[in-house]
Amino acid sequence: MKNKNKKKYAVACVTSMGLRITPENRMAVHNSNRFLLQATSAESNVLNVTSSLGPECLVLTRFVQGSPMAAFIKAQLRARNIAYVGPDVPQGGPWGYRHQFNIADSGFGLRAPRVWNDRAGEVGRTLDAKDYDTKQIFGKDGVKVLHLSGLIAAMSPETTKCCLKLAADAKKYGVLVSFDLNYRATFWKGREEELSTQFLPITDHLLQLDPASFALVTS
C-alpha cells in the first residue's frame, strides 16, 4: 500500500536563482581572469545540505526563456538533487530580464571578503504565486517544510505577495513554514513592520541570525 503521509519533497523554497563568480586561488576580482561559476541563491543554499543527504528538495522560481544561464542553473539544481518548478519568461530584448550575478572576492590575509551584487533586471523579482500548482505540489506530491527568507520576501512587492500566498496555501495542507532572518535591512527600509505583522504569524520555525534581527520582528 502507498503511504499517504509520505512527502515527495523534504524542503521547498521560494527563490530567485542567480550566478556567483569567484576568482580562483582567492585572488582579488580586479586581478583575476579566471573565475568559478556557480548557480546559487540564499534560499536554495539552505536546501543543499538536505538534498545532499538524499531527500529530494524543490525550488519555486522563474527562469529567462532561452538563456544559457538559465540552462546552467537548471543543470546545477538537478545535479544537487533539487527539482524546480517555474515558468520560462521571455527576456524582452537585450535590456530585459536576466538572472542576477553575485561577484564574490573570498578575501586573503588582511583583505576581507567582499561581495558585489549585480541585480538590475532580475527575473526573480517578478515571482507570482499563480505560476505554481499548489494543490499538486503541497497536496498531492507533498512537502514537509516550505522555507522562506527575508531576502526573497523583500525583493519586490510581487515577491512579498508571492511568499505570503504560497505560505498560506502550504499551511492548508499541513506544511510547516520556516522563515530566516537573513533579511537584508536595506531591502526592508520603510517596511520593517511587515516582518512582524505579516511574516511572523505564518511562521512555524523562525531562524534568527542575531539578537538585533530577532528584536526587529518581535517588537
Residue ranges: model-predicted function:
Residues 17-18, 108, 120-123, 151-153, ...:
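Short glycine-rich anion-binding loops that position phosphate/pyrophosphate groups of nucleotides
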Residues 13-14, 86, 117, 177-179, ...:
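General beta-strand structural signal in soluble alpha/beta enzymes
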Residues 19, 23, 78, 82-85, ...:
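Generic secondary-structure signature for well-ordered alpha-helical cores
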Residues 145-219:
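Conserved beta-alpha-beta core of the PfkB/ribokinase-like small-molecule kinase fold
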Residues 8-9, 142-143, 203:
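Local beta-strand N-terminus motif with an aromatic residue
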Residues 1-12, 168-172, 218-219:
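Conserved phosphate-binding/catalytic region of the ribokinase-like
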Residues 2-87, 129-130:
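Glycine-rich phosphate/adenosyl-contacting loop at the front of the ribokinase-like
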Residues 56-150:
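Conserved N-terminal subdomain of the carbohydrate kinase-like
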